Amino acid sequence: DLILVDSTDPIGPGEGLFTTEFYQNCFNILSDNGILVNQSESPYYDQFSHEMKRAHKKIKNIFPISKVYQFHMPTYPSGHWLFGFASKKLDPIKDVDFDKWNALGIKTKYYNPQLHVGCFALPSYVQEMLDNE
């Protein structure tokens, strides 16, 4: 199973989707092989990076596997945005089966196995923010 949280910013109506209680509820309803993906703001601006660090800290205190990955979206502030990946058992790099993916023969304009691995390699300043929270 999969929970995708493509929420608004953690201010106002979207605030409830960034709470420890919400993440704990996600953990409770996911199977052992389930995955939670949440939008985690941008590391570039102080206000956004503060929320990114808070969300990651809450999630990593609940889920045994908690990672952050990045993508670039020119229409978002700074263009550099992050997502969280959380699971009880599945690691987004160690447990992915690229042979199975390649056997599907799906042609994409953006996604490929190298990008999948690379998006989890964070810039030093982002990794330091997450490590120091």
Located regions from the model:
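A short glycine-rich, Lys/Arg-flanked "PGG" loop and its adjoining helix->strand segment in the class I
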Residues: 18-32, 60
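Glycine/threonine-rich flexible loop motifs
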Residues: 10-18
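Conserved beta-strand signature within the Rossmann-like core of class I S-adenosyl-L-methionine
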Residues: 33-40
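Short SAM/SAH-binding signature in class I
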Residues: 1-6
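Short "lid" loop at the C-terminus of a central beta-strand within the Rossmann-like core
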Residues: 9-10, 41-45, 74-75
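Conserved Class I S-adenosyl-L-methionine
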Residues: 23-24, 49-70, 84
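SAM/dcSAM-binding transferase cores
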Residues: 78-133
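Conserved class I S-adenosyl-L-methionine
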Residues: 14, 40-56
